[in-house]
From Swiss-Prot:
Species whose genome carries this gene: Thermotoga maritima (strain ATCC 43589 / DSM 3109 / JCM 10099 / NBRC 100826 / MSB8)
Chain segments annotated as transmembrane: 41-61, 133-153
The UniProt record lists the keyword Transferase: no
Key word Transmembrane helix present: yes
Record's GO cellular component terms: plasma membrane
Location of the protein in the cell: Cell membrane
Membrane topology note: Multi-pass membrane protein
Matches recorded under InterPro entries: DUF5317
Record keywords, A-Z: Cell membrane, Membrane, Transmembrane, Transmembrane helix
UniProt name for this protein: Uncharacterized protein TM_1467.1
Length: 168
């Protein structure tokens, strides 16, 4: 679903003309953004998934002055914690999987009983108008809101016109 959210937010950013603002930011540690996604594809999930979320968190924190990044950081921490305490996989509530007729992928594991380890898991069903279905978590929602804030809301840039006092 992240791809759907990203593409919708990007399209809205282009349509509203806010894309020029997105390109103006001075991003810190931009290399840290892609590496975590690659790490999550590799074996040794118990080690690499927590490491990937630490890298994402650092990227978001280093860029916390950019609108939406604080929410993305909080969402990433919630998801990273949940995956870390569940063997590197995100738990998905099995009844929701069955309701949506979805299968698990390599990054997810099913659960049927809630515990402290699954409190922040994927259990919220989402139906998109174009027929795609997902199960998402509270952390995902925070990340998605952060992405929309980043792409769509117009920032209050630091370069405000200087005020010259009136001479009497």
């Amino acid at each position: 679903m992240m791809i759907d959210v990203f593409l919708i937010a990007l399209l809205l950013s282009i349509l509203t003309g806010n894309i020029k603002n997105v390109l103006k930011y001075n991003y810190k540690g931009l290399y840290l953004f892609a590496i975590p996604f690659v790490l999550q594809l590799l074996p040794w999930k118990e080690i690499l998934v927590p490491l990937s979320f630490v890298m994402l968190f650092l990227f978001f924190i280093w860029n916390r002055n950019i609108p939406g990044f604080k929410l993305m950081a909080i969402g990433a921490v919630l998801n990273g914690f949940t995956m870390s305490v569940n063997g590197g996989k995100m738990p998905v509530w099995e009844p929701t999987l069955k309701l949506l007729n979805l299968d698990l992928d390599f990054k997810h594991t099913a659960f049927t009983e809630f515990s402290w380890k699954t409190l922040l898991a994927d259990y919220i069903p989402v139906y998109l108008p174009w027929g795609r279905k997902f199960v998402i978590s509270v952390g995902d929602i925070l990340v998605f809101i952060g992405v929309f804030i980043f792409f769509v809301l117009k920032p209050r840039f630091q370069t405000q016109p200087s005020r010259v006092p009136h001479e009497s």
